[in-house]
Amino acid sequence: MSLLLSFYLLGLLVSSGQALLQVTISLSKVELSVGESKFFTCTAIGEPESIDWYNPQGEKIISTQRVVVQKEGVRSRLTIYNANIEDAGIYRCQATDAKGQTQEATVVLEIYQKLTFREVVSPQEFKQGEDAEVVCRVSSSPAPAVSWLYHNEEVTTISDNRFAMLANNNLQILNINKSDEGIYRCEGRVEARGEIDFRDIIVIVNVPPAISMPQKSFNATAERGEEMTFSCRASGSPEPAISWFRNGKLIEENEKYILKGSNTELTVRNIINSDGGPYVCRATNKAGEDEKQAFLQVFVQPHIIQLKNETTYENGQVTLVCDAEGEPIPEITWKRAVDGFTFTEGDKSLDGRIEVKGQHGSSSLHIKDVKLSDSGRYDCEAASRIGGHQKSMYLDIEYAPKFISNQTIYYSWEGNPINISCDVKSNPPASIHWRRDKLVLPAKNTTNLKTYSTGRKMILEIAPTSDNDFGRYNCTATNHIGTRFQEYILALADVPSSPYGVKIIELSQTTAKVSFNKPDSHGGVPIHHYQVDVKEVASEIWKIVRSHGVQTMVVLNNLEPNTTYEIRVAAVNGKGQGDYSKIEIFQTLPVREPSPPSIHGQPSSGKSFKLSITKQDDGGAPILEYIVKYRSKDKEDQWLEKKVQGNKDHIILEHLQWTMGYEVQITAANRLGYSEPTVYEFSMPPKPNIIKDTLFNGLGLGAVIGLGVAALLLILVVTDVSCFFIRQCGLLMCITRRMCGKKSGSSGKSKELEEGKAAYLKDGSKEPIVEMRTEDERVTNHEDGSPVNEPNETTPLTEPEKLPLKEEDGKEALNPETIEIKVSNDIIQSKEDDSKA
């Protein structure tokens, strides 16, 4: 249609004889996105002299590299490359003829910008604790709507008010921390075009280094080949790099320094004095750096250079010296090992005997009026704040002999050997001698006197044969410190005095318990038992009952009921039996009916119940029988009666009913009558729920034993057959060889061994002679009845005993004021603290 219109207009012009201009542009309106290229063709009808293009600002367009105008006859083409927003507007195409007349046409160019992301960097890194701004520059025309998403949730909906969108569409995170790391999505939308685009941005939070140094101060000793390791751990993100500095210089690994674990450990080797000082650990990463300092203090450890053992004498004085060196100068402490008591410089004991003085690493411990308790080990400890050193010395105290035992009086009698012990301690050890009347014992004419040395003891064994052997003996001990002696007395022993306070404390038809008091004097020799004599009043024969040890209580058994008895008590020591006590009379109880029996029960096997009878008071006559009556409690059954012999200790009730309660009455009978009945009630358990009998439940004991023997024989046969085929031995192999006429050398040897053994048993076997001793023949301790060693030819029959003894647990006690000591027909009153038996 437009073409026809053009030809029509052309015809009009030709016919009129005038050339009219007419301008057209191929496009009247164009939309173009930024960055796209477009061209427009302008056509002039007529005889144009020129065709020009004008930009929206009215300026004539001159060709450039981006905007190009090309003219081809009556056409002119405008090309715009890589259009931008500024290119938008109305472009005019103007044609001019020779007469200067112009015609023009216009085209409207609209330029829009697609969603464009500029300067979007991923990842974006921030420092922990700062206010972060995540940059996302997005543009379009019209302006886009921008939103941020984190974990598929818009940040504007997150309750954390640290997140906010800025006016420039960037995301702000206040006080960002490590937990905020992740992927954030920047999304742009153009509603008019339905256009959407996004960019995922990785946000990384860098944490500045934080150094952890578990120990900052170190002590080391110089010139000892020691080494010290510093530890420096650093946390942060990214992982910090650790380096060490000393005096401002970087430490590198060499013979002096060792670096381990990514420089987390620094070891200083062969420490010397100059190695002391600060060591700086520095940790660095993108977020910053941190440093901490470790300090190495190098000291000379204390060392004791002089300490030696000392020897002094009792009541003397001595000075103990301890010298030590070190840097810093150490303090010296003394410690007495025996009691753990410590002394430091300036200390003084309460009694003023011990005093410590010292200065500049030297200490002196001075002791005056030396006591034996001061002897022993002394520890010297030199200590400073970097360590310590300890050594020990020994203080030896020499002293004159000391007699340990306080017992100086011993008792014996003619024909009874006794050992007198002279126990001496001394330093140095003393020489010990026995004397009597200035005569050193044993003398040639004193065959009944012998001496034995056992360590620090010198034992004098005396076997008295006459009154002359009783009297004073002297023990003398000597060393280079001094001489000491002690006098001992061998006194003539006597039999004990009579016990008193005899009484009956318990009484029955056939027994009586007798109690009495110990005698006032045991005669100088310990009492080893008491003798209680008992007889019926009408009888002349006394029965003797011996006490157990020195117990002052004796039980008399097998007495006749309702009978009057007489008793008397005498004490017996090594010398012999003492005087009897005053005779006491008592009467046993008459025979009566037994007391009610005491019963306790428990279920027995099956439908039976076991009633156990506790030993009871039989009234003085043996129990002849028990009469048992029982019946069920749940119904009015008649009583069933059962009699059991009196020597039985239990009763079995059989054929009872499951879960049934029973009532039992038990009466005991002796020859005088019946006791009151004892009532006992019990209930039977429910019937057992037996699911299945096993094989062995159905077999008797003999069958089970038979099966066991058969199994054992089967195992032996299998073992013998295995030995036959594997090792060519066993019973089967023996039978085979005998049947085949073979005989091994080992069999001959075995036979010879058997024959030799038989000959030995026949000719040389003799049973050893074993000496048997009954319980009554055993030697017992007279004090508590325990076994003791039997006396030999050098052991006296009596043991020395300290006086006085405590009156407790049945042991003998002797009042020293009542003892007379017989010495060579003289009477010597013993002292309370020296009288020892």
UniProtKB/Swiss-Prot annotation:
Keywords: Cell adhesion, Cell membrane, Disulfide bond, Glycoprotein, Immunoglobulin domain, Membrane, Phosphoprotein, Repeat, Signal, Transmembrane, Transmembrane helix. Residues 719-837 are cytoplasmic. Residues 20-697 are extracellular. The modification Phosphoserine is found at S765, S786. One of its GO terms (biological process) is axonal fasciculation. Residues 1-19 form the signal peptide. Residues 789-798 have a biased composition (Low complexity). PANTHER family: CTX-RELATED TYPE I TRANSMEMBRANE PROTEIN (PTHR12231), NEURAL CELL ADHESION MOLECULE 2 (PTHR12231:SF231). This is Neural cell adhesion molecule 2. It comes from Homo sapiens. The gene is NCAM2.
